[in-house]
Amino acid sequence: MLNHECTNNNNNPDPVYLKVAIIEPILLACIDGSSFSEIDRCVQRVIPSSELVQREYIFYLSNSSFISYNGIEKKYFIEPSGLELLEVIYVQAERRIVEYNDLTLKIE
């Protein structure tokens, strides 16, 4: 499990756990900027998930400053902390302590 010391901004005291298998394609899609539909296609290639789940993940990634939204371009972009998170994901995946599909990110 990846721990991220970030306060989620919805005043919910409970931590949120996000699957890395969904986070990674979202972050990768945002490197060059992507609309929601482009992100959806990238995620669906890796793991089937509903639009609602993807919107929830985007919400938490945005609130935690891993990605940002540009309203003029209507695209999501990765932030420096999102690039750092990708690096952490790859290091954890290389260590193979936990199966990739079981890796989660804890947002507090």
Language model region names:
Residues 26-34:
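Short helix-to-turn junction characteristic of helix-turn-helix DNA-binding domains
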Residues 74-79:
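Minor-groove-contacting beta-hairpin "wing" of winged helix-turn-helix DNA-binding domains
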Residues 83-108:
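Short, amphipathic alpha-helical interaction segments positioned at domain boundaries
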